[in-house]
Amino acid sequence: MPETVDLRAVPYELDDEQHAWVEETLAGLELEEKVGQLFFNLFHFGADSFSGTNLSNAEILAKYHIGGARYHGGTSEQVQDLLNALQASSRIPLLVAANCESGGNGCCNDGTYIASGAQCDAARTEEVPFRTGLVSARESAAVGVNLNFAPIVDILLNWRNTIVNTRAHGSTADDVIRSTDAKARGMRAAGEDVAVCIKHFPGDGTEERDQHLVLGVNELGPAEWDDSFGRVYAHHIGAGVEMIMAGHIALPEYSKLLDPSLTDADIMPATLAPELVQGLLKTRLGFNGVVVTDASHMLGMTSAMRRQDYVPRAIASGCDMFLFFNDMAEDFGFMLDGVRSGVITAERLDDAVRRILGLKAKLNLHRKQADGTLQRAREDLAVVGCAEHLQWRAEAADASITLVKNTLDQLPLRPETHRRIRLYYLDTDSGGIFEASQRALDDVREELERRGFEVTVNDGTSRVKGATLKYRDEVDAAIVVANVVGYAAENNYRIRWKTPMSTDCPWYVHEVPTVMVSLNYTTHLHDATMVKAYVNAYHDNPDTIRLVVDKLTGESEFRGTYNDLVWTEKWQAKL
């Protein structure tokens, strides 16, 4: 018998009034309204480039009765205006989610980045992830968000994986628990009624592929999973996490243990696997909260079966909310047909909607709607990008920037001894969902010049090196800055030189002192094993760049700690 929700228990612990609101609201819903509560819609500023609808936001709410909202982009004022309007137009208050994985920058364009998961791990202190969670909740609440799709509780076990390379909080269960527990506590400490959603069950980071592009597979056996990802999920469930995002990631060995009839051909991502969501997560681990699918346009889901089938199957399998429409009318019809045909039973539908309404009641959204405090005011935005948060960003960078190696003692670099710097800058194509800062190269150059260095930026579009003696006569040191950023256009991201055997390639490591600095991914030594000094800095914001230069010049100590994945299983990387 599938587990059904207990609204008196963790994570809801509803009082009599809250419980009554849930039951009365549920009893008053028509079938179409119940189905609508299952959906998160992705809203846009301007034309909808995702589902292609021509409906106004108010028309979407009136026609499809959605339970949750996400949005893409926008300044804090734009986001606040959007979310206020959505809440004003919705009869039942909305769950409004943001991806604040690293701070308030996940809820609005002018929000404050604090620290990525990798950065939190490198800092080896609970203060950095706690502050990251605190800022995430403060700034997201100010714009009207009440649910954070974070922290990420994946474990980075495979160094080739780049989709969670910087987002995961470590390479062991203990490290992930330490950092993500602090981040969740920081979110709750804000006192802003922002719910926590951990992701991506049953766990990313074991393989190199990206579930955005292909079915993800976690190949761990049941005992291994229980002692790693299982411990992480059990910890957060015990701590009262309200929501868990199921990934489009299969866990085949555990699926076959729970349902011995399954063959390889039957293995599904967790989002479509009742033995994982109902059996492992809700029954064995005792999760009583809301399960939401990861985004339904991802290939890990779309490659499983027809959309007509997987839309209702996700809910039938134990997920309670479905993330994003493709075509609104079609998807809504698919879900409604799934209920009418019995794919989704009446009991499963009511249980899912009861969980959704229960979370809304826990967040007091109905009370705020009744007393007129659900919409946020302009003065609330004063916290976004405030001086305290910017100071915390700088302190997080200082605590985490990591000297991975300096085997020839080439650091520090000082203008008195290494005045003429050849600067090599490596980035990725622009135009993606995530991309490198357009200011990063200028920021690095200006910081170096401010300290008295003479900086020449290399033109890496050529493969002509020129005379090596002339190079040594003109250059005192080389700094290679890798700002490789990417998301869901490739299964993994590595350094891509500007041209075959570009002059950016570190051919010069034995000619002049050479240091490589990564502003994002932590494993570039795989493609640059020859460099003798290597630094992981984790981000390209101005504070981080300033502090990196402080540390390269010996004005500040390196304080971050690396994990052994930085060596990418290459013995020569340590030389």
Where are these predicted regions, by residue range?
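Hydrophobic faces of well-ordered beta-strands that scaffold small-molecule active sites
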Residues: 35-43, 67-71, 94-102, 147-151, ...
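Short, acidic/polar
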Residues: 47-63, 128-139, 224-235, 305-311
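Active-site-adjacent structural elements in enzyme catalytic domains
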Residues: 76-93, 126-142, 354
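Short acidic, glycine-rich surface-loop motifs adjacent to enzyme active sites
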Residues: 36, 57-76, 236-268, 473-490
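A substrate-binding/cap region within the structured catalytic cores of diverse enzymes
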Residues: 123-145, 152-173, 180, 184, ...
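Short glycine-enriched loops at secondary-structure junctions
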Residues: 44-47, 96-106, 146-156, 198-204, ...
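Preference for extracellular/luminal or secreted protein segments
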Residues: 1-60, 273-274, 283, 304-575
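Second-shell residues forming the walls of enzyme active-site clefts
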Residues: 79-94, 104-108, 171-348
